[in-house]
Each structure stands twice: as C-alpha cells, then as structure tokens.
C-alpha cells in the first residue's frame, strides 16, 4: 500500500469517552494528485508519483510546468514517489484522499527534523559533562579523547563529535491512527512527529504493524 504526503498543522489533544487525554499531531492531507505512473517496461520498477498543495505560477519552472501539464493536474508544492505493491493500480490525474488510511491502525511518519544549528557533544549526543571542580579548567563541556594511539593513528568514521544538529530526515514508526477526518482532510496520529509546523510529512502504513 502506498503512502500520502501531508503537512504538519501542530499538536493538540483529544479526550476519549472515559476522559483519557490523548496527545495527537494534526496532519493535513490534501488530495494527492497522481502526476506519473512508472512501470517495469519503461522504468524498471513500479511506482506512482504524486503532488499535493499548490505553487505560485511564477515559482514553477518550465520543465515542471510541462510535466504537470502533461499529467493534466495543477502544479503542486513538490513531487513524491511511492513504490507500488503487486495488484495496486493508479491512473494519471487521479486524486487520492486521506480516506486511504480509513482502515489503517498504525502509520510511519517521515519528516525533516527542526534544525538546531552547530551543537556541542553534550547537547547533540547527550555526553555527560566533566567535573565542575577538582582541578578542571575550561574543559567542563569538551568531549574528551577522540582517538587511541599511534595505532590506529586516526579518528574512526562516525565518531560522535560537535556539528550540525537536526535538519535531517527522521522517521517515527508505528504511531497509532486516532482519527481520519475525510471532510476536513485531516489525519490525527498519537504522539509527536518530526519537523516544524507547516513542513511536509510522508505518511505510510507501518511496516512493523
């Protein structure tokens, strides 16, 4: 089953009939318009390409305009692709609504996490700080040794060090679907999802459900 592209609206909470408070993220999933269907004969794999939302005409490049015109759909804010499972069929120009998730219990949500800028190891990797006193001078938040000796004589790849934090692709798995509001194009999932308000999210049925 394919996924859908939505936009993060924000967080709120809803109450069950028993009075239990459930924290939810509201995702606006406008109709995803099919712009291209890829097949084994022409592309070597089966997939569906979609767009959603809208984009100013002045912001649409000529190649994009041609691509959208060929599909007969309004220019959207981007293009996304989902692999097709055996038996799944879509046609160019078709609209796919949030009702796709009506029977889905859990979803995986992918987004771009909020950027935090250049961060040290304490904030970025949860390193513990060194002694506040006992002779420690100006080394309270430094990472400490990053290597060994003449052997191996190098710093290993992937070593946790200071650097850019956030602003990376993150997937949160197996979030409960609390409500599907097809009338208002809203999907409510339990818990938090990556990204800032207004950012794009890819919602797929959970692989571990």
From Swiss-Prot:
The modification N5-methylglutamine is found at residue 150. Pfam families: Ribosomal_L3. One of its GO terms (molecular function) is structural constituent of ribosome. SUPFAM superfamilies: Translation proteins. Methylated by PrmB. Transmembrane segments: none annotated. Part of the 50S ribosomal subunit. Forms a cluster with proteins L14 and L19. Belongs to the universal ribosomal protein uL3 family. One of the primary rRNA binding proteins, it binds directly near the 3'-end of the 23S rRNA, where it nucleates assembly of the 50S subunit. This is Large ribosomal subunit protein uL3. It comes from Enterobacter sp. (strain 638). The lineage of its organism: Bacteria, Pseudomonadati, Pseudomonadota, Gammaproteobacteria, Enterobacterales.
